[in-house]
């Protein structure tokens, strides 16, 4: 019977990793709505898969004859720190903020199938080395393939066999977080600006995106920025190292400010002129490629959940772009 994979591995650059296996000539085509259907692989696709372990179409999940299979995946929610006061009359009363602080490990049950007991032993060695060499990587549930969680393995990798000579074993692995406690979108907001969200296999139901094309705007010309965060969480841009704010200035000014929807004010206390370009990439702040963090007020901006209305002060002529990944609980 063909075997299916219920999760997806991505390397640290968010490129899909295909597990080594021996394959049937079939694959499951994963669609953005989470459903899938079986397709036949061409001879050239099957040859590429056997030799390189990859397919040109990243949404094709090859069906394996022998190899490692993710039987199930459980992605728990984040946990909260809730402070209580014990009142004799009212019992425990919640006080203070309910901050999300951690995410329990993501648990995946693997099954390993081999042609005989010797093949099983060799495959165990192969997969141990494969998994231990991953270091930091991303995982996703195949039903939500565009929500990625950055993790690493911090345990022994052992496959339990029902009997010694049976060419089958099972391994339960826990992936611990390696960075943000949240899942993040595989693609960024500028992808939406350039391509929209329809029919491009980059966004899916359940990711919070809207069909309203006004919500696809993340670039603005001489307009106060108004853009949409489709994630379930706010985005502290200083913590998202690949996030980009770009402001191309088309006038002269002695200073300017960018104000986010929470009222946080970023200020550059430096004269600018036409053609100057400010970039904030994570924690790096440059003007025309030169570090200018010392000439700011050291505030970093936050993208709120839902609609964001930002303000550019002391500038009327500019081009503003923002690029970030949505975050999900």
Q: Where are each of the predicted segments found?
A:
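Polar/acidic, low-complexity leader/linker segments enriched in S/T/G and N/D
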Residues: 1-80
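Short, acidic/charged, Gly/Pro-enriched secondary-structure junctions
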Residues: 4-10, 111-156, 309
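Surface-exposed loop/edge segments in extracytoplasmic proteins
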Residues: 14-20, 146-150, 263-269
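Non-catalytic, solvent-exposed interaction/assembly segments
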Residues: 67, 73-82, 88-93, 103-109
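Oligomerization/assembly interface segments of phage tail-like spikes and tubes
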Residues: 90-118, 166-181, 308
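Solvent-exposed loop and beta-edge segments used for protein-protein assembly and interaction
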Residues: 99-104, 131-133, 165-169, 237-241, ...
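Short beta-strand and beta-hairpin "edge-sheet" elements
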Residues: 138-184
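Intrinsically disordered, low-complexity segments enriched in serine, threonine, and glycine
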Residues: 189-329
